[in-house]
């Protein structure tokens, strides 16, 4: 199966609230390639959910084009939009399962609507229950399932009609961290084995870090940053992106930790480490010039097969040597001195 290609070209959405107009989307332009996982992140009111509603045709742009596999869906008739939606799966934060239907019954429902015959429905439901790891839960009702199991049913239902595109709107927000990890692993499996394009809407950078290929950071209806997860994590350009990255990495000392670190001699610097940060070159030069250097806080992780992290280092030595260390790294990476 090939995933859907999505192209936003100058998409703007203005809502008329009566007293004043509210711009929910402001000139959004970006492309999601077939089989890619795009993470869209932003705080409440950034325009994330409106963006999703544009993709499945539930909202119409005020201006701009929205192309799915090269076809502009803006202005399409409702009948044609229904045909488009038949190839789009949707996963919700609150699961949206029918309480009166079993897990199997919930998965079967969209197949019934599509007119699939009974034998094929059963085959497909059994196949999907196995795919999401719930073969023994088909006869259970939602109230008998955990939150993670309910979301697995939701994912299976979204896959029932073999979509080429999956939209996940805050799909893990109601789940605990361990269950969130399991659901994200399942979405990765969906993408890897079925080739489906996935758009993940979230306010959690850890979700982006875990699953996405690309990330679009939204603020006030605009995409303020867009690129690979590694690019945005290692070199965030806007304040909103920097805030999101800091919530995920948590490698910058807080005020209390900084106070403890400053109780010792030496100057402290918090440095972003990436493959081209130049840190090890600068550290070697400082050591050759007689300075001592040690990592006192932080750590390194892996993002999309790249090493990345933040560390706080303490330097002792001549002022000119430490000044040179700082000046060099200001040209290659993000470095901040912790002031006494």
Swiss-Prot record:
InterPro entries: AAA+_ATPase, ABC_transporter-like_ATP-bd, ABC_transporter-like_CS, ACT-like_dom_sf, MetN_ABC, MetN_ABC_transporter-like, NIL_domain, P-loop_NTPase. Its main location: membrane. It is a peripheral membrane protein. Its EC number is 7.4.2.11. Residues 6-245 form the ABC transporter domain. Gene3D superfamilies: 3.30.70.260, P-loop containing nucleotide triphosphate hydrolases. ATP binds at residues 42-49. Keywords: Amino-acid transport, ATP-binding, Cell membrane, Membrane, Nucleotide-binding, Translocase, Transport. GO terms for molecular function: ABC-type D-methionine transporter activity; ATP binding; ATP hydrolysis activity. It catalyses: L-methionine(out) + ATP + H2O = L-methionine(in) + ADP + phosphate + H(+); D-methionine(out) + ATP + H2O = D-methionine(in) + ADP + phosphate + H(+). It is found in: Cell membrane. It is an enzyme of class 7 (translocase). CDD domains: ABC_MetN_methionine_transporter. Transmembrane segments: none annotated. One of its GO terms (cellular component) is plasma membrane. It comes from the Bacteria. The complex is composed of two ATP-binding proteins (MetN), two transmembrane proteins (MetI) and a solute-binding protein (MetQ). Part of the ABC transporter complex MetNIQ involved in methionine import. Responsible for energy coupling to the transport system. Belongs to the ABC transporter superfamily. Methionine importer (TC 3.A.1.24) family. This is Methionine import ATP-binding protein MetN. It comes from Corynebacterium diphtheriae (strain ATCC 700971 / NCTC 13129 / Biotype gravis). The gene is metN.
């Amino acid at each position: 199966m090939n995933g859907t290609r999505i192209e936003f070209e100058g998409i703007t959405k203005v809502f008329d609230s009566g007293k004043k107009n509210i711009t929910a989307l402001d000139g959004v332009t970006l492309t999601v390639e077939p089989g890619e996982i795009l993470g869209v992140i932003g705080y409440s009111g950034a325009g994330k959910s409106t963006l999703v509603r544009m993709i499945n045709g539930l909202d119409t742009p005020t201006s701009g084009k929205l192309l799915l596999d090269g076809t502009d869906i803006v202005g399409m008739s409702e009948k044609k939009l229904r045909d488009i939606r038949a190839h789009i799966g949707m996963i919700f934060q609150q699961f949206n399962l029918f309480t009166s239907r079993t897990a199997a019954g919930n998965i079967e429902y969209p197949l019934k609507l599509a007119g699939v015959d009974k034998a094929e429905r059963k085959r497909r439901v059994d196949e999907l229950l196995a795919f999401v790891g719930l073969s023994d839960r088909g006869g259970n009702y939602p109230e008998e399932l955990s939150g993670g199991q309910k979301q697995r049913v939701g994912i299976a239902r979204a896959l029932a009609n073999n979509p080429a595109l999956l939209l996940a709107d805050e799909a893990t927000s109601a789940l605990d961290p361990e269950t969130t990890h399991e659901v994200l692993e399942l979405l990765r499996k969906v993408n890897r084995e079925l080739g489906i394009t996935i758009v993940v809407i979230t306010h959690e950078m850890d979700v982006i870090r875990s699953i996405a290929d690309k990330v679009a950071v939204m603020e006030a209806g605009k995409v303020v940053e867009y690129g690979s997860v590694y690019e945005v994590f290692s070199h965030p350009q806007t304040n909103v992106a920097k805030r999101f990255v800091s919530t995920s990495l948590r490698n910058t000392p807080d005020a209390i930790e900084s106070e403890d670190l400053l109780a010792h001699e030496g100057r402290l610097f918090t440095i972003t480490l990436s493959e081209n940060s130049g840190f090890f070159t600068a550290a070697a030069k400082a050591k050759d010039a007689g300075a001592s250097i040690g990592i006192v806080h932080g750590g390194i992780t892996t993002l999309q097969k790249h090493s990345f992290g933040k560390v706080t280092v303490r330097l002792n030595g001549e002022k000119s040597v430490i000044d040179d260390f700082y000046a060099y790294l200001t040209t290659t990476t993000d470095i901040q001195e912790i002031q006494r």
